[in-house]
A protein has these predicted regions:
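Active-site-proximal substrate-binding groove within the catalytic cores of carbohydrate-active enzymes
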Residues: 66, 70-106, 110-339
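Acidic/aromatic-lined carbohydrate-recognition and catalytic surfaces
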Residues: 1-56, 140-143, 147-150, 307
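Active-site-adjacent "subsite" loops/lids of carbohydrate-active enzymes
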Residues: 22, 26-96, 187-188
Length: 339
């Protein structure tokens, strides 16, 4: 949900069983003196952190973070808030927000996508070990102190005890859709080679993360690298979601929805029932069933088995059943979850 939604809208959606959420960030912050130069100003930057709470490098200079486009087309970098200092800003902002806006979830951008850093400020020095500690304390504040569903970007195993989902864990960083962190809603017709070969390259991908953490945290595609971003590989993304027992991610406006409604419904039906059936179960096995790796199978602790065919030829299983190209088979779904 966008941050501008009013309290009554949020409450109405809560009553419908929708997981309402708010975007938030405690890492990047722009110099207020540059605001007039920018094309847009991020309303969630912790502006009061500038400059006293910035990370300083060994030379005493503030390090550069996310770059924002200026009105003249140039890029202006943000500073980076020291992890030790970020917690106080969250502990002030979150409860104030919840007094009037009853969100049930909060997404903390960048925290698990950025490295552990050293800060050489004499006022708040930290080591990389400290950085890890304070990053996880920030997430723990959201999920445990304020009892919200908590998500963060990309993901890191150190944060698993404190978050419920990672936006971007399904999307391998170097192989995401072009400019996926900026022009997120733009649909692309041409699939870059690196995306086709590795992001949805069934010959190369292994669900190592899911084999360890599937029953602990939900993995999603990156918000600029979602299921319908590149329609030519939408089927492949759906198959990976089903195989890994993870939910899809969609982004659309009204025109996109009306144009592709049936395709969105198809994607939902092929992925969400599997995610629902396996969400709290450990992934216990992953197999390649053909020499070219086009047919793969995963098994979950509750007995669910998912088989998908990434290839362009039908596959006949040991029991004689045939799996069509881009097809999937789900067996062992508990009766209380449906298919």
């Amino acid at each position: 949900m966008r941050n501008g939604a009013g309290p009554e809208t949020i409450k109405a959606m809560n009553d419908l069983g929708v997981l309402t959420s708010r975007y938030d960030i405690y890492q990047d912050v722009m110099d207020p003196g540059k605001f007039s130069l920018l094309q847009w100003k991020h309303g969630d930057w912790p502006t009061e952190a500038w400059p006293k709470d910035l990370i300083l490098n060994a030379a005493g200079d503030w390090i550069k973070g996310w770059e924002v486009e200026a009105k003249d087309g140039s890029m202006i970098p943000c500073g980076v808030v020291c992890d030790k200092q970020a917690i106080a800003y969250a502990d002030k902002r979150v409860p104030e927000d919840l007094k009037t806006h009853p969100y049930r979830c909060r997404f903390i951008d960048t925290t698990t996508a950025s490295p552990w850093r050293e800060c050489y400020s004499p006022d708040h020095p930290i080591t990389r070990t400290d950085s890890r500690k304070y990053k996880t304390e920030l997430l723990d504040l959201v999920s445990n102190k304020y009892k919200l569903v908590c998500g963060s970007e990309t993901g890191h195993d150190a944060a698993v005890p404190y978050v419920h989902y990672f936006e971007g864990m399904m999307s391998l960083g170097p192989y995401r859709a072009p400019d996926s962190g900026r022009h997120m809603q733009k649909i692309l017709d041409e699939v870059p080679d690196r995306v086709a070969k590795f992001q949805v390259g069934w010959q190369y991908r292994l669900p190592l993360w899911e084999l360890v953490y599937h029953d602990c945290v939900v993995a999603q595609w990156y918000w600029g690298d979602y299921n319908n971003k590149l329609p030519a590989i939408w089927d492949k993304r759906d198959l990976f979601n089903a195989l890994y027992g993870t939910p899809p991610m969609f982004m659309f406006d009204k025109a996109c929805w009306e144009k592709s409604r049936d395709r969105f419904v198809q994607s939902y039906r092929n992925t969400c029932p599997v995610a629902r059936a396996t969400s709290y179960s450990e992934m216990t096995d992953h197999k390649f069933l053909t020499a070219d790796r086009s047919v793969q199978q995963t098994t979950f602790a509750n007995g669910v088995t998912v088989t998908v065919n990434f290839g362009d030829r039908p596959y006949k299983g040991a029991d004689g059943t045939e799996l069509v190209p881009n097809g999937l088979s789900v067996k062992g779904v508990p009766s209380d979850t449906g298919r």
